[in-house]
C-alpha cells in the first residue's frame, strides 16, 4: 500500500512539474502495524503459537493431524496381538472358575468381562484407526446389539470393580450374553426375526411330534 501511494505521488509530481505549488497527497499514509502493538500476538509469536481462528483451513487440518500419534503398522499389530493374548489369558482363567461358578460368580464375570474388553480393544487396533475414527465421528452407525453389549460390558466391570456386588455382576454378565446372542443372530443373512420364528416353529413341530408318536 505504501508503494502504491509513493508511485501515485511521483506520477502527480511529474504531471505538475511546472506548477508553483507542490502536489498534495491524495491518500493519507497508513501507519504500518508494528508487531509490538499487540502484546498477546507478540507473545504467541515468540511461543510459536497462533490463535485457532487465525489459521487457514490447511493449517488447521495439518495441526489436527500432528496431534494424532503416529503408530506404524507393526506397532499396531503388536499392540493388537498383546491385547488378544491377554484376552485369551482372562478367558482361560475364567474357565478355571467354571466348575465353582456358583461360589465364584463375581470373579468369573470379572475375568470374562476383562477378556471381552481386551478382545474388543485388540480387534479395534487390528482394524485400524481410520475405521475407529469413522465410528467415533458417527460416519458408521453401530448396531443396537453392539451398543447394548458395550453398555452391559461397562456395567459389569463397574459392578465387579466399583460396587463389588455379586448380584449386579451376575446380572451384567447375563445381559452381556443376551446382547451377544442378539448381535450374532442379527448377523444372519435372513435376519434375527426370521431366525427366531424359524427356531420357534421347529421347536413347536418337535413338541407336536413328541406328543403324537408313541414312546
UniProtKB/Swiss-Prot annotation:
Q: List the disulfide bonds.
A: none
Q: Which InterPro entries match?
A: Vesicle_transpt_Got1/SFT2, Vesicle_transpt_SFT2
What the entry lists under Pfam families is as follows: Got1 (PF04178)
Predominant subcellular localization, coarse grouping: membrane
**An individual GO BP term:** protein transport
Q: Which residues cross the membrane?
A: 83-103, 108-128, 143-163, 167-187
Q: Which residues lie on this side of the membrane: Cytoplasmic?
A: 1-82, 129-142, 188-215
Q: One GO term of the cellular component aspect?
A: membrane
Q: Which residues lie on this side of the membrane: Lumenal?
A: 104-107, 164-166
How does this protein sit in the membrane?
A: Multi-pass membrane protein
Q: Which UniProt keywords apply?
A: Membrane, Protein transport, Transmembrane, Transmembrane helix, Transport
Tell me where it resides: Membrane
Relate the protein's function as given in its record: May be involved in fusion of retrograde transport vesicles derived from an endocytic compartment with the Golgi complex.
Which PANTHER family would you find in this protein's record? VESICLE TRANSPORT PROTEIN SFT2C, VESICLE TRANSPORT PROTEIN-RELATED
Its family remark reads: Belongs to the SFT2 family.
In its UniProt entry, what is this protein called?
A: Vesicle transport protein SFT2C
